[in-house]
Each structure stands twice: as structure tokens, then as C-alpha cells.
Amino acid sequence: MNIVYRFRIYPNKSQKELFARTFGCVRFVYNRMLAEKKEYYEKTGKVLKVTPAKYKAEFPWLKEVDSLALCNAQLHLQTAYKNFFRDSSVGFPKFKSKKNPVRSYTTNCVNGNITLQNAKLKLPKAGWIRIKQHRSIDDRYILKGATVSQEADDKYYVSLLYAAEEAEHEIRSV
């Protein structure tokens, strides 16, 4: 079972700039992959398999942001395609717009690269960020990932995804 906690974060100026770059890079990779997949399918009738690593040689500024955020953009595009083919009423995947007032990116917790302690959160590439932790988190939960988002009013939030162990059901004999 998964549990998500959403907290307000207070990044400094350099962290805000990093988040803005990351939001832009994630949108760029998503849109670029979608465009290439559409174009390749129209030409050949086959599905193109692309990864964000392909773009880092061509666009070196993609190396400045968290690589897992770019990988999650690829996963989000794959999910959009799966949803479209599963149910056509969902609609074909759409390009992401700069004008959307809510920006976000998702990163995964690998080897403890995301840490929460003493009202501070450590994120890849961003470092330690002040956080308004208004509830405690059970120690039995395992941190799986984080989604950083910026709302239209320029407030930043983080949603932390935790995996909770399912309680084992006891089997009783009668």
C-alpha cells in the first residue's frame, strides 16, 4: 500500500532556479520524445523506443538537472500512451505547455538520495531544503520518491511517496 504526504517547502533562490530548469527540462524531454514518436510512427508505422539519455549528448544542459526526473518524464509518456491504447476516450498524449501555471517533476529515491530529517529535505542536485513538516511519518514506511511542484501563486510543495508494509493476515484454525 502506498501513502503520500504533501508538505510545503521553502527553497532558496538557487534552488528555485534549479527547480525552474528541471521543470523546463522535463517538459522539453517529454515534448521531444512525443514529437519523435509521432513522426516515426507516421513514417514507418512502428513505435520508436527512445530514452532521455539520447538527448544529453545533443543538449548538454540536460546534464544540469536530476536524471531520474528526466526518466520519469519518459515513464509519464509511456503511461499516457498505455492509457490511450487501453481506452481511446482518454485521448492521444498532448504536448506540455509552458503556460500551465502548475509545474512539477518526479524523482525516485535511490540509495538514500532523498532524505527527510530535522525539518529539512534533501533532494538530488538541490541539496537541503527547509520544509514545513506538519505531521510525523511512521518509521516503518519506506520512502520511494518525491514530486516537487510549483503552484500558480509561486509556492512550492513536495509530495513524498512512501510504501507501507501490508499487515500480514493471521490464519486461524477452528
Question: Which residue ranges define each predicted feature?
Answer:
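Nucleic-acid substrate recognition interfaces
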Residues: M1-V174
